[in-house]
Each structure stands twice: as C-alpha cells, then as structure tokens.
A protein has these predicted regions:
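A short beta-strand micro-motif
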Residues: 2-13
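A subset of signal/propeptide-processing and intrinsically disordered low-complexity segments
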Residues: 12, 18, 53-57
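Short, mixed-charge low-complexity intrinsically disordered segments
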Residues: 38-65
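Acidic, low-complexity, intrinsically disordered interaction modules
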Residues: 13-48
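Sequence-level detector for tyrosine residue identity
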Residues: 4-5, 33, 50, 62
Length: 65
C-alpha cells in the first residue's frame, strides 16, 4: 500500500488536503486520477477518482503497511 497526499482545488481560493491509501493510481483520458487497490485475487477496484486539472499530488509514501 501507498499513501497519496493530494491537494484538491475546489474554488478560486479554496483547497482541501486528502490522504488516500491505495496500491496505485492511473491517469485516464476522461480527465481523472483513479486510485485503486487489488484484492486477494488480484482484481482491481477503485478507491477514489479526482479530476486531474484540479488535483495536485504533493507526495507519495511507498510501501506503507
């Protein structure tokens, strides 16, 4: 698992900080970051989606147990 620390822009001067625990993330053509986890059978399921144009990934902490 990894910790993803995000800053999401909500309005012109409003942001909020988010921490997501996930195995990985993908960038999609539809304009979102998709954060995902794998189950015991290696099936992927979505944990969260955030719009790429309004999301800053500030840091990633790898290998968190």
């Amino acid at each position: 698992m990894n910790n993803y620390y995000l800053r999401v822009i909500v309005g012109a001067s409003t942001t909020f900080d988010v921490t997501i625990v996930a195995d990985g993330f993908s960038m999609h053509d539809c304009g979102v970051y998709q954060f995902w986890q794998k189950d015991d059978n290696d099936r992927i399921f979505t944990v969260a989606n955030y719009p790429i144009e309004r999301t800053i990934i500030e840091s990633i902490e790898y290998g968190v147990e």
